Design a protein with these regions (language model features):
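Radical SAM/AdoMet-radical enzyme domain recognition
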Residues: 79-95, 104-189
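Canonical Radical SAM [4Fe-4S] cluster-binding loop centered on the CxxxCxxC motif
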Residues: 34-35, 39-70
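N-terminal [4Fe-4S]-dependent radical SAM core
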Residues: 2-41, 85-88
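Short loop/turn segments at strand-loop or loop-helix junctions that form parts
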Residues: 44, 56-57, 99, 161-166
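Acidic metal-phosphate-binding loop of nucleotide-sugar-dependent transferases
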Residues: 59, 100-101, 138-139
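Pocket-edge positions in alpha/beta enzyme catalytic cores
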Residues: 63-66, 100, 178-179
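Hydrophobic core segments within long, regular secondary-structure runs in both alpha-
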Residues: 72-75, 112
Length: 189
């Protein structure tokens, strides 16, 4: 059917329903939010080992990092609003990006411990329905601290490692700071 044919038929149907005694017609659709998670994003640092040629981050490779007090205040703000419709989601994804987030693994570990403790203490409905998500260049993935964090949180963890395709393609854009050396071999090791 085209629009010109269908629209008059729909109007006739609604008129028949209305005159048949149905005055409150509602089209019921399942909520688009059903099964959707609330995303809370922490930019824990602007620092990175790389100087990717297409990086979107303004002021990239600055040593700026998120203070613990800022992270704690943000967590408290979010968890205090459990009854707010803007936070009425079945689950939550606590997302960590940068720069390179794993450069701040100690801060991230402290943030995640606080989130888990507070959700438990408050009996928050997200306590058994959360994930920690990371977008990383993968260079620090094998570090002892990162691996310890992964083991501790593995049941609630998603990690995306950015690779641009083949080694040649990756190394064209994803180079170390102050160098043209590509990072592919360090990521896939």
């Amino acid at each position: 059917f085209d629009r010109d044919t269908l629209l008059p038929k729909i109007k006739i149907l609604f008129e028949k329903l209305k005159y048949g005694g149905i005055n409150d017609i509602k089209i019921v659709n399942p909520s688009w939010q059903e099964g959707v998670s609330k995303n809370i994003t922490f930019i824990v640092t602007k620092d990175c080992q790389l100087a990717c040629k297409y990086c979107y981050l303004v002021g990239k490779n600055e040593k700026e990092r998120m203070p613990w007090e800022t992270a704690k205040a943000a967590i408290d703000y979010v968890l205090d609003r459990e009854d707010d419709p803007n936070f009425a989601y079945e689950s939550v994804i606590w997302d960590f990006i940068g720069g390179e987030p794993f450069l701040e693994i100690d801060l991230i570990d402290k943030i995640c411990d606080y989130i888990k403790t507070e959700m438990y203490r408050r009996n928050h409905h997200w306590f058994n329905s959360y994930r920690f998500s990371f977008s990383t260049n993968g260079i620090n993935y094998d570090s002892e601290k990162v691996q310890k964090f992964i083991k501790k949180n593995h049941e609630h963890l998603s990690i995306g490692i950015t690779i641009d395709g083949t080694a040649r393609k990756h190394d064209l854009n994803r180079v170390y700071k102050n160098s043209e050396r590509g990072s592919y071999k360090d990521v896939v090791r």
